[in-house]
Amino acid sequence: MVGRRGWQTGLVTSLNEPSPDAAHTSDAAHTPDAVASGTASSGTDTPDGAPSLSALAAARIAVEALLDGGVQHVVVSPGSRSAPMAYALAEASAQGRVELLVRIDERSAGFTALGLALSTGSPAAVLTTSGTAVGNLMPAVMEANHAAVPLIVLSADRPDELRGTGANQTTVQPDLFGEQVRFAVDIPAGSNPERAVQTGLSAATGAFADLAPGPVQLNLAFRDPLVPEASDQLPVPAERQRYRIGTEPLIMNLPPASTDLVERRTVVLAGHDAGPVAEAFARAHSLPLLAEPSSNARFGPNAVGPYRLLLEHFGSGAAQPIERVVLFGRPTLSRPVAALLARADVPSALYQPVPVAWYEPGRRTELPLESLADLADFAGRGPSDWLDTWLLAGSAAQHALDLVLAQNAPATGPSVGSLVWKHSRGQLLLGSSNGIRDVDLAGLPAPEPAATVYANRGLAGIDGTISTATGIALGGRQETTVLLGDVTFLHDAGGLLIGPGEEQPQLRIVVLNDSGGAIFDLLEHGAVREAGTYGDAVERLFATPHSVDIAALAAAYGVGHSAVSTTAALAEALALPVEGRSIVEVRTDRRSLRQLHARIKEAVAAAVGGVLAR
């Protein structure tokens, strides 16, 4: 039986409901048909009477299957029960067949693997020992689930005879991640893991119909001995293969819209992970493009900058109201966009050529369309003055916003977002909370994309941002910048820990340090704080102020550090090439942030109102 979220987890729910005649096998049971019917279970250690494999022999088979299935990177956290996999991976690494990264903290390891999968487009694996080590992967697995990222969890476990006995570091690991994974299998000690690994990789990469890519758990039980035999040794080292060189951001072209299409005042919304097809569609149909930064569509002649401040000027009572909405990707950043999509009088359609992991069918109001031809019929083509009106309003809004920001020599969140966007190149990761929203507000769309943009918008948590950025930088093999707030930075400070023998990424970490969480001041909590009715509760419970010396923290981890407080100094720092790891700390004051946003909104409203009244 598949629960309400079966569209997302597909092979998981039934996997852990074995039929009476499943025979607790772990070989033939791992075919897609067997998994779907609920017969992939485990129990005895020698399924079908097959000879029991040694721990290292089984691990070598698992590694071969992983590499054959496209895994190029494995992040390893140390542990004894996972030793057979670690030794087998070391052998493959010595042959130049896989890249290994070592991280002490499993939570950081999970997000590093997530970043590797994001930047390479290939499944990336993370290996842990048994016990709490596996549980530390839950945040990365949850993000990978909702963001459709092929993350392979390799969790080592005790053999069946030690489970439930109080054996050290032993808990119930099979299906630990529940509905967060596309596939979970418990592979008994001594059994051949090949087909289970193959099925897991198929599920992770979206090979099964109606199942989006996403994380899987391969729970591998090992029995002593866990180390190689005395006669074993590493292969002769071969030249290490580098699997990826960062590519330039993409630009697509579509044929111009047919003149037979109906003219409609349609807008194109490009949410997270929309891709360049959104820009191409807007351009081909002469429609305004309202693109979030992580859409990788925020460029081109149709892109409108501070669009979220313009939507109220094109509402139902406006001279030129929005008639339809075409959505690419997932919108996550602003309430005005959510309000537009919720309007019953404005039909909307979602371009969805493949299964996605961020919503359940029937739970959203947009009409899902699989083909661009159907989308074109829905959207129509823009009237002659529709795009021009939006571009004029957008230009006026951008100018007004820039004037307000120019009045403040000290750096502010929006001015930092504007500068980071302007100077971005290579790869850019935008942290959750205010950072990505500052870029969305103030980042000027460019004629062509300058960087490939990433963000953890699956669940939009602040977890693991530094580690994700490290994985992105190492996977893409080009300079990478990450913009994040101080709370997000401190939440993953352990992600700065990279051993002396490990490869160092080209990573610039821009930290907007306003000594706490500023986003709550821009929400309703800011009004509560201003009213003073709850004393210092808002500051203490939501802003969570701190006095961390980021320079000292950087020095402790061996990471370069510089501090700036003005927009001019930040622009100079961002113009420098990225060499190794460095932190640019931007020291700001959040006490007047709510007032700054009010001034921006007022200035933009006046400027746009003047343009539209002509």
Which residues does each PLM region occupy?
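Structural motif
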Residues: 77-79, 189, 219-222, 269-274, ...
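Glycine-rich, acidic loop regions that bind phosphate or pyrophosphate groups
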Residues: 144, 155-200, 291-398, 499, ...
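Active-site diphosphate/adenylate-binding microenvironment
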Residues: 59-63, 80-86, 389-477
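Phosphate/pyrophosphate-binding active-site segments
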Residues: 15-16, 45-53, 329, 338-436, ...
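Thiamine diphosphate
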Residues: 143, 154, 161-174, 438-614
